[in-house]
């Protein structure tokens, strides 16, 4: 599954119903504007807070091993929500270790978070593969 995020309840209920059948969900954390976190505050796309708050919501329905974060690989790959690979890595740190968070802090640490994906490999290539090179290297050193 690669759902866009604006209708949390619909997608997450489907994911919950499918349960262990799902291998991985890479939710699209871009092209969505601002959205609320579990704490009731709104977070703007294109920030570490948005990524961690929305992933934290998904992680209330699925196991960390089923969840990846999906982001555009370059500024041209999406209408909004692009972040540099360093922000993606900070979100991964926040979600897995509770460090490098912004103002939003997840309700738990998820060390077995599945990973990240970019939209798309073609956009990443046009941007010097900066997403895949940086995020892949960072995922490799995260504690499991």
Language-model features and meaning:
Residues 1-144:
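Secreted glycan hydrolases and related glycan-binding modules that recognize and/or cleave
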């Amino acid at each position: 599954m690669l759902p866009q995020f604006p209708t949390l309840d619909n997608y997450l209920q489907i994911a919950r119903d499918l349960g262990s059948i799902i291998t991985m969900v890479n939710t699209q954390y871009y092209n969505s504007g601002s959205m609320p976190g579990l704490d009731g505050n709104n977070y703007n796309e294109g920030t570490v807070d948005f990524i961690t708050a929305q992933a934290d919501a998904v992680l209330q329905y699925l196991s960390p091993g089923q969840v990846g974060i999906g982001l555009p690989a370059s500024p041209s790959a999406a209408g909004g929500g692009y972040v540099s690979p360093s922000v993606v890595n900070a979100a991964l740190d926040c979600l897995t270790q509770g460090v490098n968070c912004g103002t939003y802090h997840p309700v738990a640490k998820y060390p077995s978070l599945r990973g990240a994906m970019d939209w798309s490999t073609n956009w990443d290539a046009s941007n010097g593969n900066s997403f895949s090179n940086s995020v892949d290297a960072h995922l490799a050193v995260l504690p499991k």
